[in-house]
Amino acid sequence: MKRRYFILAAILIMIIGGIWFGKRNNFFNASANENAFRDTNHLILTKHARCRMDCRHITAAEIKDIIHNGNVNYSKSGKGNKGDDTYALEGYSNEHQHIRVVVAAENEGLMVITCIDLDHEWPCNCY
């Protein structure tokens, strides 16, 4: 009898731990638009992003590649200035540039807010 209660208690602890871990890591907040920030069919480059791309020698093709294949840096992602969700995607270009691209999914398409070369500081006069 004691063994049965021990097994039930262990199972209950595992279930509660799983729920706690899942909520802590947002596993239960997944939606159908979870990867909307990776859809580059309608890419909108802000004036700031175009300027940064020019300064840092980053092409639109490299931006798309990072958006499709890059890793989300959750510590650099979050709410933008307008209250929208922003995603910081990081990866390496074909030219071995370590790039971070910050995007936000908008009604009109995917907006590229900025891009950063993480390994090299380029002179730039963008504002």
Where are these regions (language model features)?
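Ribonuclease/tRNase effector modules and their secretory precursors
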Residues: M1-Y127
